[in-house]
């Protein structure tokens, strides 16, 4: 690949280096991202090139944030319910624990600073984001607000 055609996507480069995607898949995703506005990672998941978990783990690596498997996490219900269910679903976030005035919150998109600020305002606590998959966040929200075995809204 010529030097001047190197992609400018660190996420894409990380996925390519991990052999999760090929160079042609990366280039196609970059083109679609630019032409459609669709996030590159979402394009790769939607088209079956990578799994949702591969995307979340790579995003966590890229941003230097922890990845959390919400199916295995011990979610503190009182903190999880500090935000409205509708907000949690719409923004794909869920507070999962609290320590020393900090609210650890599972997020699908840790780059959305507005959501992180909203959470701080709603809870009065500093927010520490951890990354989880969108589907795991939705499943956890349903467990928190409806109990185990409940059907999603």
Language model: regions and residue ranges:
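Polyanionic, low-complexity intrinsically disordered segments
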Residues: 17, 41-125, 143, 147
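Short acidic/polar beta-strand-loop edge motifs in secreted extracellular
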Residues: 29-36, 71
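Short, solvent-exposed linear patches
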Residues: 5-14, 36-43
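Short, low-order "capping/linker" segments at domain edges
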Residues: 138-153
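Short hydrophobic alpha-helical runs that function as membrane-insertion/retention elements
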Residues: 126-133
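Short, recurring structural edge motifs at helix starts
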Residues: 1-3, 27-32
């Amino acid at each position: 690949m010529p030097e001047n055609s190197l992609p400018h996507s660190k996420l894409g480069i990380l996925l390519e280096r991990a052999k999760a995607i090929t160079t042609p898949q990366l280039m196609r995703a970059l083109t679609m991202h630019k032409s459609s506005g669709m996030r590159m990672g979402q394009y790769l998941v939607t088209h079956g090139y990578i799994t949702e978990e591969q995307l979340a783990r790579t995003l966590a690596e890229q941003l230097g944030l922890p990845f959390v498997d919400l199916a295995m996490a011990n979610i503190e219900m009182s903190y999880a319910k500090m935000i409205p269910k509708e907000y949690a679903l719409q923004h794909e976030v869920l507070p999962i624990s609290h320590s020393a005035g900090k609210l650890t919150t599972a997020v699908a998109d840790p780059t959305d600073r507005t959501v992180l600020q909203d959470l701080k305002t709603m809870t009065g606590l500093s927010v520490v984001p951890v990354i989880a998959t969108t589907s795991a966040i939705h499943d956890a929200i349903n467990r928190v607000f409806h109990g185990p075995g409940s059907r999603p809204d």
